[in-house]
Design a protein with these regions (language model features):
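Non-catalytic cap/lid and distal C-terminal segments of serine-dependent acyl enzymes
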Residues: 1-143
Length: 143
């Protein structure tokens, strides 16, 4: 099992799709696909850090793209992690979460659950509640 919030949620999706035999279930909270973020190399420190981590250019067709990794598992007919994904309605990155939601909802090969809570944003109160729901999803605790 692996789970994370925000950037950590993206990282958990990335690692679970890269190593599904090790991470059979993933919880991703407020976690969009970073490959869906438009990148403008403006010379800022943030841009330079991104280039050091991922390289310069489009990440969609690289190992850093969540949907790219998910497509590879389908093509290879590999095992796939179960995915619990949640985001607050007021989260500033809700659009990136919707892109992932739409992708996984349209690919029945994945055991995927999405939860979106009204009137809550990118915050710990939401993540604490969703972590409990994720643990129920895993079967580690009862409802």
């Amino acid at each position: 099992y692996v789970s994370g919030f925000s950037n950590g949620g993206y990282g958990c999706l990335h690692i679970a799709l890269k190593y599904p035999e090790k991470y059979g279930t993933v919880g991703a909270f407020s976690a969009g696909d970073k490959a869906d973020s438009e990148f403008l190399n403006d010379g800022s420190e943030k841009s330079l850090r991104r280039i050091q981590l991922y390289g310069d250019g489009d990440l969609h067709k690289t190992e850093y793209g969540i949907t790219y990794q998910a497509d590879k598992l389908i093509e290879q007919e590999s095992i796939k992690p179960r995915i619990y994904h949640a985001c607050g309605e007021l989260d500033p990155w809700i659009d990136m979460n919707h892109i992932l939601r739409d992708y996984f909802m349209s690919h029945i090969e994945y055991d995927y659950v999405y939860d979106e809570i009204e009137q809550i944003g990118h915050e710990w109160k939401f993540w604490r509640e969703e972590l409990k729901r994720f643990l129920v999803f895993t079967g580690l605790i009862n409802n």
